[in-house]
């Protein structure tokens, strides 16, 4: 490979622009049946929140009907929503989460 060709290839690699993936909010929705303790447990287990932060989010959900559990790439956000729905169903709670593009 010639020196000119090597310089051309490296310049092309250096010129490639990388973009951050779009981020999505995972929203937790209030309902009249899911216990506050279960919501706090979900926030701690699935979203890695401290107990204090989880309780704050849970109170926001309770008073405002919706709260943000976290901000993730689409694939991770979808996975977390699916896990929450599965755990809620196993525990016979109607807890719902959704995604919202940032």
Curated annotation (Swiss-Prot):
Gene3D superfamilies: 3.30.1390.10. It comes from the Bacteria. One of its GO terms (biological process) is protein catabolic process. SUPFAM superfamilies: ClpS-like (SSF54736). It holds the Pfam family ClpS. PANTHER family: ATP-DEPENDENT CLP PROTEASE ADAPTER PROTEIN CLPS, ATP-DEPENDENT CLP PROTEASE ADAPTER PROTEIN CLPS1, CHLOROPLASTIC. Belongs to the ClpS family. Involved in the modulation of the specificity of the ClpAP-mediated ATP-dependent protein degradation. Binds to the N-terminal domain of the chaperone ClpA. This is ATP-dependent Clp protease adapter protein ClpS. It comes from Desulfotalea psychrophila (strain LSv54 / DSM 12343).
């Amino acid at each position: 490979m010639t020196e000119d060709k090597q310089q051309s290839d490296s310049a092309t690699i250096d010129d490639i622009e990388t973009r951050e993936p779009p981020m999505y909010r995972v929203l937790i929705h209030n309902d009249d049946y899911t216990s506050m303790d279960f919501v706090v447990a979900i926030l701690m287990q699935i979203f890695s929140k401290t107990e204090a932060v989880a309780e704050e989010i849970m109170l926001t959900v309770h008073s405002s009907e919706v709260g943000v559990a976290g901000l993730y790439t689409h694939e991770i956000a979808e996975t977390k929503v699916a896990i929450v729905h599965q755990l809620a169903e196993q525990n016979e709670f109607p807890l719902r989460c959704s995604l919202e593009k940032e």
